[in-house]
Structures are given as structure tokens and as C-alpha cells.
């Protein structure tokens, strides 16, 4: 019964739906935040690394009507879920799904933008289900290795957008700076006004750039904050 529920579980957004299949990463606020926040300009080519269900690819396709998107995942179950969701979407012709390991994948071109919600659990615990272990732990995609791939995948003036928990995000940024990358847009996310920052949204560049720091509070006393509603209203059904 659990397997059937997982296979049939779906999440509806305003312009598309996501079916999770047996993918290791369910729909999360992290993914919606990143897909809504990434890229202040309109990139023409986007690489979605570790695409999971294809959520970020579909969000980018909706936001950027002229973008062509490549969605990549090492897990076959994730690739199959992303491919199914691509085919069911209004933008199937602008999204290409590939089953490949980003550390060994050799694209024919570089990308104007990269989007990635990386795995981050470094606790050493191993999830019982191998698909979830691959998705949630830095087993198959170490942050250092991912950072080292960025200059090979990005165009010279390209940008890579990420979301991570605060501690892991700070470590990731430190590694990126050591590798000669530069932080541009940077947003600290708080769940509520009285709770500390728990997520970082940030963008990395290959060339020096002016850092732009902001803060986002998800919920206030009366419900979702106006800033969160404005950011996500094109996607969530109940956001007007």
C-alpha cells in the first residue's frame, strides 16, 4: 500500500502538476523557494542538476518562456519521474531529461544558468531506502566535486543558484570561494520572525560581482508573509 501511495502521489501547481513516482525527494518548500527565487535575469539555457521529480525545471520553464532546460539525475527513478512530468507539462518541447552522473556527464555546450537543490545530510546516517539515501545524503554528489564542475558547465558570465540549510550553505560558500567562485545574490530565510535563519538561497558566479544580501520570512502571525506570497504566488494554488 505504501508503494502505491507514493507512486500515485501528486502535487498541483497553478500551471502544472508533479507526480512523485518512486523518486527519493518529495515536493518541499525548499524546492519551491529556489525555483521562485533563482535568476534575476532571464537565462536562455538552464541546467537542473539532480532534478528529482523535475519541479525546478518546470518552474523555470514557466518563469522563462524562452529558456531551454536540461534536467539531469543519476537515479533512474528520479529520471523517470521527471520525464513523465515533463511530458505532462505545457513546456515539454523546451525540457530535456537525461539519466546521467553530473560528475562524468559531458554536455555539448555550456549553460547560462544552473539550478540545484543539493543533497546535504552529512551526519553519517544512512537512510533505509537507497533512493532516499542518494537524494538526501552527500554520498553520490559531494559538494566539493559539484563546485569543481561549475566552471566546466557554466558560460563565463553564467550563474548557479542553490538552496541549503544555513550551516551547510555557509560551508558550501566557503568551499566555492576557495575554488575561486564569487557570491552574488544571497538570501537568508527564516521560518518565522522569532526563529533563526534556517535556509540560505545563494548564487555563484565565475567572475567578481557585487553581492546583494536580502532576508525572507516565510510566516508571520497572521499566516504567510506578504514577501513569501509575492515570491511564490505564480505557483501555489492558494496564493493570489
From Swiss-Prot:
Localization recorded for this chain is: Cytoplasm
Function, as annotated: Specifically methylates the adenine in position 37 of tRNA(1)(Val) (anticodon cmo5UAC).
Q: What is this protein called?
A: tRNA1(Val) (adenine(37)-N6)-methyltransferase
The Swiss-Prot or TrEMBL record describes its family as follows:
Belongs to the methyltransferase superfamily. tRNA (adenine-N(6)-)-methyltransferase family.
User: So what EC number does this one have?
Assistant: 2.1.1.223
Q: Which Pfam family, an example, fits this chain?
A: MTS
Question: Which PANTHER family does the entry mention?
Answer: TRNA1(VAL) (ADENINE(37)-N6)-METHYLTRANSFERASE
Q: Could you confirm whether the keyword Repressor appears in this record? A: no
Identify the main location: cytoplasm
